[in-house]
A protein has these predicted regions:
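Long, contiguous amphipathic alpha-helices that act as assembly "spine/axial" helices in icosahedral shell
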Residues: 75-132, 197, 282-284
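Sequence/fold signature of self-assembling virion shell proteins
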Residues: 2-10, 142-184, 191-196, 201-304
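Glycine-rich, mobile lid/loop segments that gate access to catalytic sites or pores
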Residues: 118-156, 160
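Solvent-exposed alpha-helices and their adjacent loops that cap or buttress functional pockets
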Residues: 79, 189-191
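A generic local secondary-structure boundary/capping motif
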Residues: 75, 185-187
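N-terminal alpha-helical "arm" segments
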Residues: 1-27
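Assembly/oligomerization interface modules of large self-assembling protein complexes
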Residues: 25-83
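Solvent-exposed, flexible loop/coil residues
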Residues: 71, 82, 93, 97-98, ...
Length: 304
């Protein structure tokens, strides 16, 4: 359906002082704070988790050396989606509009819609991967944030707290402790650490106090803020305005191949006129996918 003169009645008459509703600011590329972006040239991408070797064994004098096996464990698949939107304007609406160019106005609105869709899709794994929802799975078939990520040799690896908690000094410290305890597929310590915290806007004031105060917050004790003095979250925090759980928080770790975005086709726009009707059509389109390869790349807590 094309935008016609019946939908733009006031713009066909002189005396209109202002048009408003399409000039809002927008939150730009907040997904870039979470995901590593890579390009793709196929319908989907797959990344395979490998298992190395277990702990080396003591070899007795004259005895044979122990052998171990390495293997593939699970596969993370990124299936690209095509995201697109279009609009059309009648020839008469373009001719009779007395104010700004309709095409310029609505192509800006089209760009806004495409940008918003990307931010919503980007945050989907973080929302749906939380324990109470658990509909977004990592490659091992377990909810993205879980205490039961299975490994080849065990024990399970956790990237959430056993008891969900709101963001405070204790929950943040416990999260950082658990990150430091992460192991690989054979149970070997991997020296993981937190890098950056991602939070909803409701948590920004709490995060500012936790990450910037030199002393402990919420206590009369004259203690230093250990999180700050030890540099436990060196990249600080970022607010993501698309998170819907007001008390959740997430910590990106330095584990490689964690949260990833693949761009199959970057954003392109096109326009064409229809010979029969005279309508002019405008389209925007891109293809991409969001997901996770190694769940150890992020730690998420749902809040109490």
């Amino acid at each position: 359906m094309a935008i016609s003169r019946s939908q733009l009645v006031k713009e066909l008459e002189p005396g209109l002082n202002a048009l408003f509703g399409l000039e809002y600011k927008r939150y730009e590329n907040q997904h870039a704070e979470i995901y590593t972006n890579e390009s793709s040239d196929r319908a989907f991408e797959e990344e395979v988790m490998l298992s190395g070797f277990g702990n080396a064994q003591v070899k007795g004098e004259g005895a044979g050396v122990s052998f171990d096996d390495a293997q593939e464990t699970y596969t993370a698949r990124y299936s690209h989606e095509t995201v697109a939107l279009a609009f059309a304007i009648t020839e008469e609406a373009i001719e009779d509009n007395l104010y700004d160019r309709l095409s310029a106005r609505y192509t800006k609105a089209l760009a806004r819609s495409m940008s918003n869709a990307k931010q919503v899709k980007a945050i989907d794994p973080l929302i749906k991967g939380l324990p109470s929802t658990a509909t977004f799975k990592s490659g091992d078939g377990v909810a993205l944030f879980s205490t039961a990520h299975t490994t080849v040799s065990g024990p399970n690896v956790a990237n959430t707290l056993a008891t969900q908690s709101d963001l405070n000094e204790t929950s943040l410290e416990n999260s950082l402790i658990q990150i430091g305890k992460m192991t690989d597929e054979r149970g070997l310590r991997i020296a993981a650490r937190g890098l950056k915290m991602i939070i909803p806007s409701e948590n920004q004031f709490t995060a500012e106090r936790l990450m910037k105060s030199q002393g402990r917050t919420g206590t009369a004790d004259n203690d230093i803020n250990a999180i700050v003095s030890m540099g436990m979250v060196p990249q600080g925090y970022r607010v993501n305005n698309y998170l819907t759980d007001s008390d959740a928080f997430y910590i990106l770790t330095d584990v490689p191949n964690g949260m990833k975005m693949f761009t199959r086709a970057p954003l392109t726009t096109a326009m064409e006129g229809d010979f029969d009707t005279g309508n002019v059509r405008y389209k925007a389109r891109e293809r991409y996918s969001f997901g996770v390869s190694d769940f150890r790349g992020i730690f998420g807590v749902e809040g109490a």
